[in-house]
Every structure is written in structure tokens, then in C-alpha cells.
Amino acid sequence: MCHGFFVHNHLVMFTSKKLLAYLLLLVVWLPTHSVAQQAIDEDDTGAWYMYFFSKRFTDSQWGLQGDVQYRNWDLGGDLEQLLLRGGLTWTTANKAVTLTQGYGNITSGAFGDSDSTSNEHRIYQEALIRHGLGERVKLRHRLRTEQRWVEGQDFRTRFRYGLFMDIPLNDTKIRPGTWYLAFYNEVFLNLEKNIGNGRRVKTFDRNRLYAALGHDLGRNFRLQGGYMHQATSSVDKGQIQLSLHHSF
């Protein structure tokens, strides 16, 4: 009977210690797990809200174009970038090619709770080449060079190539009332690797892949909502994008 009592007590003590160990592990694990679940990192989906405009002067091949983009690390409130850009355009008589000389100002915000920002001044040159693929598909090739003055870095230049595609769904071309699909892929290449103070960047800067559903609202407005995946040399990040396109 004493032997049975000893065994019973031993089992109770062992079980109690084991249960205590599990409880301690749970107490330690739960707070850290909760923090990990709640923490925001650069892989969380961001959101870009954008307005694009283009203006052709009357009876002229000259015009203006520009955009305002409010980019967030999250869905809203954590500023990634505020981009203001505009340029003077010249379009060939057949409207197949548009050349642009422009300027951009970019305010970049730090990720997370920090309110610190940095500024960039940018001059760019662009060639946009348009052509069709069959009756419905419209393609645009965009080649852009950028001269960049980024705060805290040496002068830098960058090359970009983007391929854009629009496909009308309920018509043969995009006009008021038309729903359409919009796609693009754009690659960015750094032309300098040294950016000052012993810091270097890779030639590959980033790639953006985008898909969206668009609707021609009429009165020279189009609305697009979609998703863009951006892969850089260090971060892969998804972005929800909502854009309003205005031509006048």
C-alpha cells in the first residue's frame, strides 16, 4: 500500500511538474506570438491612391502630363511616399509616340511608427510608344531615364522599361461605359552602384507586376482598381492600387 502511495505521489508530482512546464511555456509563448501576429512588417499589403492626368493643347502636338500618388506601407496612414510629378509632352501626328521631359518631387516616409522623412528631386525623360495587337489589345512601351537627387545620397541615375496592356471586355475599344483589363510589368535598373559614404546598390533596383479591372466613366475619366506586386533586391511587397485617369 505504501508502495502504491509512493507511485501515486510520484505520478502526481511528475504530472504537476509537466503541467507547470506547459503552463510556463504557454505564458512565455502567448505574448510573443501575439506581438508577432500584430506587428506590421514590410511584407504586409500596402495601398497606393493615384491620380494621373494628360492634357493636349488645342491644335497642337504639345501637352502636359502628371500624377499625384499617395503611397502607404499599410492600407492607409503609414506614409511610404508622396509623389508629385509633371512634364511637358510632344506627340507625333499619328499619336503613336509621345516624348516627355518632366520633374518629380518625392517625399519618402520611414516604415512603422517613425515620422521621419527624406526628400528626392527627380528629372526624367520618357518615350511612350503605342501600338495594337489584333483588334482589341492595346500595348504601350514606356522607356524612361531618371536623374535623381536623393537626400543623404550621391547623385544617381536610373533606367526603367515598362510594358502596358489594355484589353476591353465588352467592346472592341475603350470608350465610355467600357470595362477593361489593365496589365503592366516594369523593370528598374540602377546605372550607378555607389551612392555615397561607402554604400552600394545593385544594378537591379526593382520590378513591378500589375493587374487591374478598369472602367471608362465617360467625360474623359477612367477608374482602375488592382493589385501590384513589387520585388526589390531586399523586399517583396504587395500593393492594392486605386487610380483615377483623366485626359482633357
What are these regions (language model features)?
Residues 37-92, 98:
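Start-of-domain marker
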Residues 62-66, 84, 97-101, 139-143, ...:
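Transmembrane beta-strands of outer-membrane beta-barrel proteins
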Residues 68-74, 92, 103-109, 131, ...:
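Transmembrane beta-strands of outer-membrane beta-barrel pores
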